[in-house]
C-alpha cells in the first residue's frame, strides 16, 4: 500500500485512496496558525508512513527545506512545462499554459524532477514535448499536456526509481544501464 497525503479535503483521489484501503490523510496549511507549524506537521505525518519515495502531483506548496534534506533525492514532482521554461514561483496549473500561449511557443510539455530547496529547480528525471496548436486555449493545452506527457512520464519515473534505473550524480540524473 502507498499512503496518500493531500492538501485538499475535497479531492476525489482522497476518497479513491480510502476506498481502495490506502491510508489517506489531509494535511492542509489552512489548519495551522503558521507555515512553520504546518511544515512541522507535514514532516511528522510523512515520517509516520516511512516512505521510500514521495510523489508530488498538483501539490501547490513549497516543500519545507527540512523535509527536502530528510528525503534528499526521494521526492519527485511533475511540472506541466519543459523546465526551465514556465516554472518557478507563480507557474502552476493553468497559469503555465496561459503563459506558454502568450509567449507563442510551438512546443511545451512536462517535466518530472527531483525536489530540492528551489522551486522547480531539482535534477530533471524525464521530459516529454507536446506540440502547441494554433487554436489552443489554456484548457485544451493543459489537457493535451496531461494526456500526452504527464500521465506517461510520472508512472515511468516512479517505476525507474523503484527499480534502480536512475540515480543522481553531481546534481544530474543518470540512467543506469
Which residues does each PLM region occupy?
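Short, surface-exposed acidic-centric catalytic microdomains
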Residues: 8-37
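Glycine/small-residue-rich loop that forms an oxyanion/phosphate-binding "nest" at active or ligand-binding sites
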Residues: 26, 30-51, 56
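Short acidic active-site motifs
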Residues: 12, 41-42, 63
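Short, small-residue-biased leader/transition segments that mark boundaries at the very start
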Residues: 1-7
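Donor/substrate-binding cores of folate-linked one-carbon enzymes
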Residues: 53, 57-171
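Generic recognition of long tandem-repeat/solenoid scaffolds
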Residues: 173-176
Amino acid at each position: 500500500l502507498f499512503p496518500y497525503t493531500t492538501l485538499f479535503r475535497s479531492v476525489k483521489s482522497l476518497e479513491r485512496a480510502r476506498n481502495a484501503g490506502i491510508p489517506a490523510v489531509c494535511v492542509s496549511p489552512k489548519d495551522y496558525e503558521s507555515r512553520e507549524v504546518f511544515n512541522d506537521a507535514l514532516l511528522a505525518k510523512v515520517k509516520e508512513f516511512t516512505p521510500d519515495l514521495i510523489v508530488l502531483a498538483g501539490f501547490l506548496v513549497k516543500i519545507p527545506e527540512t523535509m527536502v534534506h530528510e528525503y534528499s533525492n526521494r521526492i519527485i514532482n511533475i511540472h506541466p512545462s519543459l523546465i526551465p521554461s514556465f516554472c518557478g514561483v507563480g507557474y502552476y496549473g493553468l497559469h503555465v499554459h496561459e503563459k506558454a500561449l502568450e509567449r507563442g511557443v510551438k512546443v511545451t510539455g512536462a517535466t518530472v524532477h527531483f525536489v530540492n530547496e528551489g522551486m522547480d529547480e531539482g535534477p530533471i528525471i524525464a521530459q516529454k514535448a507536446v506540440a502547441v496548436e494554433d487554436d489552443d486555449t489554456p484548457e485544451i493545452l493543459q489537457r493535451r499536456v496531461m494526456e500526452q506527457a504527464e500521465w506517461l512520464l510520472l508512472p515511468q519515473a516512479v517505476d525507474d526509481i523503484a527499480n534502480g534505473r536512475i540515480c543522481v550524480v553531481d546534481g544530474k540524473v543518470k540512467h543506469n544501464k
